């Protein structure tokens, strides 16, 4: 398993090692060991808006996940906007760092097959798993 973190923004310090550690823990738990790669692009609102155009949207989002299949050499790409995360973190009572990792986990779950747009049941399951990882890997560890 290889996790590539590409930081294309200068708005916030990014801890690439911690991003890789969290990604590896989630992926190991969800899919086990494998000979695959995952790319995580850290960017700003302007850049993520360009990616969103492929989805027919002209506004930024906090995260986009492009899943290519778990049997592929590159299982997916995750794009995260630090600007969007910075704006929304206070709304959820999170620090920037907490919100960043919460959104990272969200993107990872999409890569391994979770979806919250198909049904309320799927959404409930995905957000429960996301919250579990967040409290296991981020929130509870800070105390």
From Swiss-Prot:
Its EC number is 3.1.-.-. This is Endoribonuclease YbeY. GO terms for cellular component: cytoplasm. GO terms for biological process: rRNA processing. Its cofactor is Zn(2+). Disulfide bonds: none annotated. InterPro entries: MetalPrtase_cat_dom_sf_prd, YbeY, YbeY_CS. It comes from the Bacteria. Belongs to the endoribonuclease YbeY family. Binds 1 zinc ion. One of its GO terms (molecular function) is RNA endonuclease activity. Single strand-specific metallo-endoribonuclease involved in late-stage 70S ribosome quality control and in maturation of the 3' terminus of the 16S rRNA. Zn(2+) binds at residues 106, 110, 116. The gene is ybeY. It is found in: Cytoplasm. It comes from Petrotoga mobilis (strain DSM 10674 / SJ95). Keywords: Cytoplasm, Endonuclease, Hydrolase, Metal-binding, Nuclease, Ribosome biogenesis, rRNA processing, Zinc.
């Amino acid at each position: 398993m290889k996790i590539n973190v590409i930081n294309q923004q200068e708005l916030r310090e990014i801890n690439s090692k911690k991003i890789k550690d969290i990604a590896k823990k989630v992926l190991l738990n969800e899919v086990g060991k494998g000979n695959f790669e995952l790319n995580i692009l850290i960017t700003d609102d302007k850049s993520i808006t360009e990616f969103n155009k492929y989805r027919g949207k002209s506004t930024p989002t906090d995260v986009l996940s492009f899943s290519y299949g778990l049997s592929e050499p590159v299982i997916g790409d995750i794009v995260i906007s630090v600007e969007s995360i910075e704006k929304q973190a206070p709304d959820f009572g999170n620090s920037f760092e907490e919100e960043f990792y919460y959104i990272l986990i969200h993107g990872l779950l999409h890569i391994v097959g979770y979806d919250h747009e198909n049904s309320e049941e799927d959404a409930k399951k995905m957000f429960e798993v996301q919250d579990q990882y967040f409290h296991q890997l981020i929130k509870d560890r800070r105390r």
